[in-house]
Amino acid sequence: MVLILVGMFGWAVYDLTDNEETDRSDFETINESEVETGQRENESEVSEQEQDKGNIGIQVGNEAPNFSLETLSGEKVQLADYRGERVMLNFWATWCPPCRAEMPDMQKFHEQTDIKILAVNLTESEAARQDVHDFVEEYGLTFPILMDENTNVATEYAIRPIPTTYMIDSNGIIQQKSFGPMNYEQMVQALNVME
């Protein structure tokens, strides 16, 4: 059993460091049934002792790495622009069924709370940029859609599977990391533990 786990860990490290060109098959998805059966990895609230504000990284307690991306409408946005506000950083794609399933709850969350949602689209994995535009119109999304054209930000945040969500507090510290779709209640619960 230990040998199997070590082998799986070794493969995961190798797979994450593989720099081949990214396409749709490079990103796994997690569906609702996997979430309900407990296969969802969820790291939540962090005590102040665990927070190292000088430690930039992608783990709970780290300062979230800054990035700059263009929105679907062409505006340049940086994560640092949102310092002082709580941020939900969500990585997604239009072809991902669990991503599609959580979007209505994300829109409701955006409308009913003070959270700032940054939805980073893995644009390189899309068939066409127009698909993203059509998706946004179909779902009536009003929060910023950031276009990760070359999946550089997804790579920096080690995104695999999608959807993946980082809940970042007003100090820029990652408070929760979730793999798989979140529903509205889970989003509110995550928001309530952040500064």
Range-by-range predicted roles:
Residues M1-E63:
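N-terminal targeting signals for export/organelle localization
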Residues I56-G61, N66-V87:
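A short beta-strand-turn-helix
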Residues R83, V87-K108:
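Conserved redox-active cysteine motifs that mediate thiol-disulfide chemistry
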Residues G84-R86, T113-K116, T142-F143:
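Loop/turn elements at helix/coil->beta-strand transitions in domains of secreted/extracellular proteins
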Residues M88-N90, A119-N121, M167:
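Hydrophobic beta-strand core positions in alpha/beta domains
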Residues R100-Y139, E149-E156:
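Structural microenvironment flanking redox-active thiols in thiol-disulfide oxidoreductases
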Residues D134-T142, M147-E195:
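Thiol/disulfide oxidoreductase modules built on the thioredoxin-like
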